[in-house]
Amino acid sequence: MRFSVVFAAIAALSSVVTAERGCGAIPHKGFATELMEAMDNARASSFSNTTAANVTINTYFHVITDGNKGQINNDTLQKQIEVLNKDYSGTGFSFKLVGSERTNNAGWASGNDDFGMKSSLRKGGYDSLNVYFVPMLREGLLGFCHFPTKNPGKRQLIMDGCVINSNTVPGGSAQNYDEGRTTTHEVGHFMGLYHVFNDNGGGCQQDGDMVDDTPVQSKPSSGCPKGKDSCPQQGVDSIHNYMDYSYDSCLNEFSPGQIQRMQMLWKQFRAGNSNRSPKAMKPIIPSYVSDPVM
């Protein structure tokens, strides 16, 4: 996930072949520490995913267009929420599309004012999911999403949510990434999941995602490479896991450990901040944010 997330207006992913799933999600600086504390808290309380209640997440879709660029019809938005619910079935989470809106804004469509876009459009509290579909992310970048934090400030509340290349929705033009699973992948970051491969440059020497039941994996997958095994430790690479970079058609699972991780972090980070929203906090001075890291 160590990819630049600075938007550029110079390239649009319209009917192009994407070589690899480009993800720009980067955990905020304190996330690793907060994650370790959350894991300690969960162990102390004997938490397991079987004790967590089912959660319905209010979801808002924002379609950003520049004229005809980025248009997504209602049927496609419905298919996207159906993909999300199918992929998260069995996790304890479901998604209710409570609102969708379209905004024609050339600057937002080209990624020139991420903060301005979100501060104007974001809805709901910290337990709501906002997804912004934009047509012109930097070439090779299909999306990014913000990791949760225990005590979000107003800027973090505003910037929360996922930005998705509009060509990746079901039936879109991002070849091999046109079944809506970029949104599934990025929402995994919203829930607190790392990539299954090692983002820290540690090769096979580190467990990159800190989940016990995902085998150590040194690099992302591309395509659907059956039997790929990038590390000598037990287990082959998780090519079918939603948090890898495989083609959409190859992805079909979260591990039990990932499900428990999502349940744990939801309970400690998002459910506890359900009443917090940007509108309920003191105003801050807007500024251009080229990097969404908090």
Curated annotation (Swiss-Prot):
Zn(2+) binds at residues 185, 189. One of its GO terms (cellular component) is extracellular region. The active site is at 186. It is found in: Secreted. Glycans are attached at residues 49, 54, 74. Secreted metalloproteinase that allows assimilation of proteinaceous substrates. Plays a pivotal role as a pathogenicity determinant during infections and contributes to the ability of the pathogen to persist within the mammalian host. Belongs to the peptidase M43B family. This is Extracellular metalloprotease ARB_07495. It comes from Arthroderma benhamiae (strain ATCC MYA-4681 / CBS 112371) (Trichophyton mentagrophytes).
